[in-house]
Amino acid sequence: MKNKLLALFLLLISFYLFSQEDQKKELNISISSGIPMLHPHTAFDAGEAQILTALCEGLFVYDPYTLQPVPALAEKHSVSGGRTWRFTIRKDAKFENGKPITAQTFVDSWLNLLNPTGNHPYASLLDCIDGAADYRNGKLKNKNQVGIKAESGQVLLVTTNTEIEHLPNILCHHAFSAVEASQLEAALKFSNIERIEKLKDSFKPISSGAYKINKFSEKELILVKNEHYWDKDNVQIPQINLFLDLSKEEAIEKFNIGKIHWLSRSDVISKIGDQRCVNIDPLFATDYFFFKTSSPNIKDAEFRNALLLAVPYEELRKGYPIKAETLIFPLAGYPKIQGVNEYNLQKAQEIIDKLNLNEEQKKVVIKIPESTYYQELAEILSAAWSKIGVKTEVKLISLNAYYNSLKSNDYDLGTITWIGDFADPLAFLEMFRPNSNLNDSDWKNQEFERIILKSHAEKDFKKRYEMLSKAEELLLGESVIIPISYRLSVNIIDIYSIGGWYSNAIDIHPFKFIKFIKPQPVPGLVKLNK
């Protein structure tokens, strides 16, 4: 009995000592390159979204495993009549500077996001709120008429223009975080900046999240626990060190000797010593080309259809692990629809002949980022379309300026990789709604919009998915996009010694849940020095 008690005592001591050491350990990661844009109203790429899970919090946060909304700055919420939402803000919710976060904080933050002069990327996701779309588009001048009110200091009142079951899922996104009043106007400064080139031009948010910025340089971003965070006692890692400028060789070496815990890059996979750490998973993301349907040469759906019929899809999609024929990655329960895959050169030529176009009308300007990858795809399309008498011009734009350039009207075909911001078809379909800030294609279809609006009120998710699949069929049927591939996420992380991190469809891993756990080594395996 004494031996058993001694063994139990030693076991408890070992766990206690590990726990004590664990609470002092820093997390070292490299998931983004360059100086990140950290204003929640203007941040756009996946690396920035991940960093903002540490610095900015809204009413809800993603569950790290299921991606379902978990109460964050709102401790509870209620819905009455399907369209009146009340969110109760936590009494101990504060920014890092100690200022309270109230219902009015969210009113000001969301109205700032909707500012019609800002054209902020995710603002249109709030169009389900009374008056939001009209205010965002400049039709409604009085922002006080938008259905976002502070009913009291702690209660945020939101009225929607339709029943929308999945509103909490949308509100997990960083764009709907609490923003400190003194930093609201800064969003306008960054609204037309695609990439921060110099540190002096960067933005440091006053944190509403689990961590705050301790140091920000061109090479690293150091985050420490926010002592004013409402849930600070459950945040286990005291400091996160993000390396912003690591070469491939540095990344490999630092990971293999244990100086980096998490890498997000695919060019190092073969050199990782412990291949258990390589996590490759399907991502709710699609690579595709889209037509600028407002362009005089591209506005005719028949001409677009001819171009699609002339595309050799096997050649265009070769080498991709998961080839895409539709816009939306096939979620569980989402109906299978007819994809874009028909190659019929004769039919394409017949359409071109019937349209009786002149030489200038048979020209397509392809705008792509400067990269060998996109140039190869553009060459395939150019060669294919030349067979039906269509000439192409390829415009190369630096990656730093590319995505902002898609707002212009100097091209006919652009490309993008889109990662769903929440695990729902609407995360993709939103980009093609008539008044969406994300709609670079300029495609407008009122039947498409009618289906989207009707789906908001549908409570049966299968019926809702059926409705949304009809909307996607409309989009594909009008030859607006050329799907290429569904993306994979690549994360190199030892999930046997790091807990709270799970592979998921949108590759978002809220930092507040990540922690070190007792390692589970593989017998005979050692870390490599090189």
Model-predicted regions and their roles:
Residues 32, 234, 262-346, 369, ...:
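Local pocket/hinge segments that shape ligand/substrate recognition
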Residues 160-235, 239, 249, 346, ...:
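Gly/Pro-rich hinge or "lid" segments in bacterial periplasmic/extracellular proteins
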Residues 491-530:
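Long beta-strand-rich cores associated with HINT superfamily self-processing modules
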Residues 326, 393-402, 427-496, 527-530:
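Extracytoplasmic/peripheral linker and loop segments enriched in polar/acidic and small residues
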Residues 30-81, 111, 206-207:
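N-terminal lobe/hinge region of extracytoplasmic solute-binding protein
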Residues 75-125, 157, 297:
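Aromatic- and charge-enriched surface segment that lines or borders ligand/interaction sites
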Residues 218, 353-420, 461, 489:
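Ligand/substrate-recognition segments at binding pockets and active sites
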